[in-house]
Amino acid sequence: SQNIMVSVSNGRLTRTAKGWSVRPTKAGVDCKISVSTKGDNGKVQNIGAKPFRVKLLPPPVAYIEYTSDGNPAKYKGSRPISKGALISAKGIKAELDDADLDVRYQVLGFELNFFDSMGNSIAKASSSGKFTGEQQDIMRKMSKGKKFFISRVRAKGPDGVEKILPPIEVIVN
């Protein structure tokens, strides 16, 4: 009987129920997967090797997840959102705009930036992906047509890299 052996450069290899899982060690450096067999006589025969390009994940996009007619919806900014939808939202999430990849991101924090009646810019921070009570109170008091910004959104993906995401312009309807 032959034993199949698999090895990888620039990565970690794990056997799964469906086959093999490869997790690259370093982005931007090729990963090479090699397969060989070991025969009954103990001789190892190389079957082949295949290089793969390992790219950095693109930056995700921040959004406010809310409920619309009982279904989850995503607000990415620059258009009006109802005050009710805004107040019912729990916080900020992040995802890749490219639907081909299902990558999970954790929002580590963000700032809600608004202008008071005197035109002064005020920032209120959250140290998670959730709106704070103070941020929710500010949104509750916003009148129709007012704008505020969600900025300095920090998100971390499965690669462990923390990224600062572009701001969201929120228009209260």
Predicted feature residues:
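Solvent-exposed serine/threonine-rich low-complexity stretches and specific carbohydrate-binding patches
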Residues: 9-23, 49-51, 122-133, 168
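Low-complexity, Pro/Ser/Thr- and charge-rich linker/hinge segments at domain boundaries
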Residues: 51-80
